[in-house]
Amino acid sequence: TTFRGQPLGNRPEAALKTCVMSATAPDMFSAAQFERFDALRAACGDLGYGADAYAYGLVALGTVGVVAEASMNPWDFMALIPVIEGAGGRVTDWAGEPLTLESDGTVLAAATPALHQAALHILND
């Protein structure tokens, strides 16, 4: 993935405690999902709400480390996958499965595979 002809790179950071996390809004989660989301939020350095799709672009840039969302539709996330993965990041559902048209609506995007793995561990602990 490139921006103005330059390859996008992600941050080398692999620690959730120092990364910025983003989500559209806290009301996008069911009660059970919010408990899992809140555990991940507590492990991250900072949280921002309201960036919507812009947050995924920031994941590709490496400015945001993790985006965790729910209640998503395929048109919300499918076009973002190649951008993030092309920049070296990873995007799956909360179970770590590839996103498809039949996915459950949960999305976990991370700037690095290490951040993604750490976030998955917390979401599924």
What do the predicted segments below correspond to?
Residues 9-125:
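An extended, acidic
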